[in-house]
Design a protein with these regions (language model features):
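Conserved Rossmann-fold NAD(P)-dependent oxidoreductase catalytic core, especially the SDR/UDP-sugar
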Residues: 4, 109-124
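Residues at the starts of beta-strands that form the adenosine-phosphate
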Residues: 7, 31-32, 120-121
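N-terminal Rossmann NAD(P)H-binding glycine-rich loop of SDR-like oxidoreductase domains
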Residues: 8-28
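Short, conserved active-site loop motifs that form the nucleotide-linked donor/cofactor pocket
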Residues: 56-59
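Conserved cofactor-binding/catalytic machinery of classical short-chain dehydrogenase/reductase
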Residues: 67, 80, 106-109, 121
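NAD(P)H-binding glycine-rich loop region in Rossmannoid oxidoreductase-like domains
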Residues: 62-102
Length: 124
């Protein structure tokens, strides 16, 4: 996968692991890295250093993978999508319906949005 001059959407990019993925992407000559995160578990503070790079930004209109229309818009002009979004495993037991909505339906939304936007590659 050649990421030079590409636009990359990192879903769940404000999470602990996602923030490290963003850091690694910015070490390469990418055009831009957009973080799509609902901040349910992620933290803006995880990306404080990365946001100093003009190529890095938060998607300004939301970050929930259950919102297919917003997700579709976020993927416009994107080359690659990296998805790290998921509901925390211990919460899945306590909130099974929400777990289904996020982990199953949300993942389907990501797949559908990737197809709709001709994404070159989804990494998840």
């Amino acid at each position: 996968m050649k990421i030079e001059n590409s636009n990359i959407l990192v879903i769940g990019g404000a999470g602990f692991i996602g923030s490290f993925v963003v850091t690694e992407l910015l070490k390469h000559p990418v055009n831009k890295v957009v973080v799509y995160d609902n901040l349910a578990r992620g933290k803006v503070s995880y990306l404080s250093e990365q946001m100093k790079d003009e190529r890095c930004s938060f998607y300004p209109f939301g970050g929930d993978i259950r919102e297919i229309d917003i997700l579709n818009t976020a993927m416009q002009g994107v080359d690659y999508v990296i998805s790290l979004a998921a509901m925390w495993l211990l919460h899945c037991k306590d909130y099974p319906r929400t777990a289904f909505d996020v982990n199953i339906a949300g993942t389907f939304n990501i797949l559908e949005a990737c197809v709709n936007n001709n994404i070159k590659k989804l990494i998840w």
